[in-house]
């Protein structure tokens, strides 16, 4: 699962985006579901809401948005089949958080590229009649290199898989050819529990943190 992430726009690895010079985004160290964040759609950065409410859902007040979608479900569940066929996107991500229970307390960990490079997660998006756009992050089984904290992970795409994800290939071919072998490029470490509160948003959240025993 991916319930929080960090994004700092990197001009270098977004050079393929058409509207980069006109786009302004402040670093966000604690992005939570329902936040408005940039997503790459048709080679442009578009402000989208993280979390999708199925259009058949009449009452959203008692429901939570789908901010993650399992890769394994893309060809199985009607909720996702249409978007998987024609509405795939890239989610720029500088790192993400996962939690693990240690000594009866949930300890947050931060995951990032070993070379501090920005990454792209696979995503799906839905355009609403009111002009807003919602998206979900695709998750997969966490690679063995990082699965000690959580058994799920965002599906991080390398350059080849980015091309496949955005291609016009048929969905079955895309599903079969996407690489899930990204674990060697990821490192993780404990961070402060201050990240538990989505109102906290500062660089200290992504710094390695070890409590000093008394």
Residue ranges and their predicted role:
Residues 1-214:
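Short linear sequence motif anchored by a di-proline
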């Amino acid at each position: 699962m991916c319930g929080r992430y960090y994004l700092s726009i990197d001009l270098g690895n977004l050079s393929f985006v058409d509207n980069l010079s006109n786009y302004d985004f402040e670093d966000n160290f604690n992005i939570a579901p329902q936040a408005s964040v940039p997503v790459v759609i048709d080679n442009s950065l578009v402000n989208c809401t993280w979390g999708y409410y199925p259009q058949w859902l009449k009452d959203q007040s008692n429901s939570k948005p789908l901010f993650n979608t399992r890769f394994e479900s893309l060809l199985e569940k009607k909720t996702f089949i249409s978007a998987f066929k024609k509405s795939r996107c890239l989610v720029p991500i500088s790192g993400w958080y996962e939690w693990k229970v240690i000594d009866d307390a949930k300890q947050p960990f931060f995951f990032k590229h070993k070379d501090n490079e920005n990454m792209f997660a696979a995503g799906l998006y839905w355009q609403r009649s009111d002009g807003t756009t919602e998206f979900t992050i695709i998750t997969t089984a966490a690679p063995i290199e990082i699965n000690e904290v959580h058994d799920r992970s965002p599906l991080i795409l390398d350059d080849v898989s980015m091309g496949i994800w955005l291609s016009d290939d048929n969905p079955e071919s895309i599903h079969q050819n996407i690489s899930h072998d990204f674990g060697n490029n990821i490192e993780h470490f404990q961070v402060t529990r201050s990240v538990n509160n989505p109102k906290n948003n500062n660089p200290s959240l992504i710094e390695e943190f070890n409590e000093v025993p008394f």
